[in-house]
Amino acid sequence: MAEQTASGYIQHHLQNLTFGHLPNGEWGFAHTAAEAKEMGFWAFHVDTLGWSVALGLIFVLIFRMAAKKATSGQPGALQNFVEVLVEFVDGSVKDSFHGRSAVIAPLALTIFVWVFLMNAVDLVPVDWIPQLAMMISGDSHIPFRAVSTTDPNATLGMALSVFALIIFYSIKVKGIGGFIGELTLHPFGSKNLFVQALLIPVNFLLEFVTLIAKPISLALRLFGNMYAGELVFILIAVMFGSGLLWLSGLGVVLQWAWAVFHILIITLQAFIFMMLTIVYLSMAHEDNH
């Protein structure tokens, strides 16, 4: 990428490997952001899908391995690690979830580990995975983003899944009438039926915005933090390619400093996503407003 400008380098690293309907009528991979944009809605971010599935499988395999090797005697390092993680998540669920459900704890564990693994890919040097993709494909211009959580499609997809569970449990616990009443009869109420009828549109607007804000904030918080972190790594990488010795030296220091700080960010963002999911589902299980 030595021939690229700093701007071109940054744009290339922030572009997804997109598969879809090309302008010439064929199906294939986009090589530029303009081609990807022309593909429209029915385009697939292959890198995001691939890494999300791969890291999900890694999570399943690690925990399956730990379960198969679990023993009541002297536990190994993997069993100790998994037990500590499970106890941590279980404690978080017990502290924040006030309903009864056998699904919430496994869901919270899955979310925390999966999001953490997707975030952790950000610690891999920014050029390694794209360069590997170029070597495998034989195309020196093909884009490839490895951090799935820097793609709003991934974070919004996870958030919408949580939103679907919120709606499902709200209706299951409160009934369809109770769910509709929650959206239309609160926060403002009146014993006068005429006044209450007038307040329904206001209540619905306020409650609907509150409801929709949950998945949007959940998705954008994770995306924004991880996208900003990835951008910092890319800007530091630009320093290395500047050709200036002092700037390259500064880049080395910043790379290590930001990587250490980023470990906190990737863990914290996974924890926040998990905790908000637990809190939102706990609210859905509450039988009163």
Curated annotation (Swiss-Prot):
It is a multi-pass membrane protein. SUPFAM superfamilies: F1F0 ATP synthase subunit A. GO terms for cellular component: plasma membrane; proton-transporting ATP synthase complex. Gene3D superfamilies: ATP synthase, F0 complex, subunit A. The chain crosses the membrane at residues 43-63, 101-121, 160-180, 193-213, 232-252, 259-279. PROSITE patterns: ATPASE_A. Its main location: membrane. It comes from the Bacteria. It is found in: Cell inner membrane. InterPro entries: ATP_syn_F0_a_bact/chloroplast, ATP_synth_F0_asu, ATP_synth_F0_asu_AS, F0_ATP_A_sf. It holds the Pfam family ATP-synt_A. The keyword Cytoplasm does not apply. The keyword Transferase does not apply. HAMAP family: ATP_synth_a_bact. Belongs to the ATPase A chain family. Key component of the proton channel; it plays a direct role in the translocation of protons across the membrane. NCBIfam families: ATP_synt_6_or_A, PRK05815.1-1. This is ATP synthase subunit a. It comes from Pseudomonas syringae pv. syringae (strain B728a).
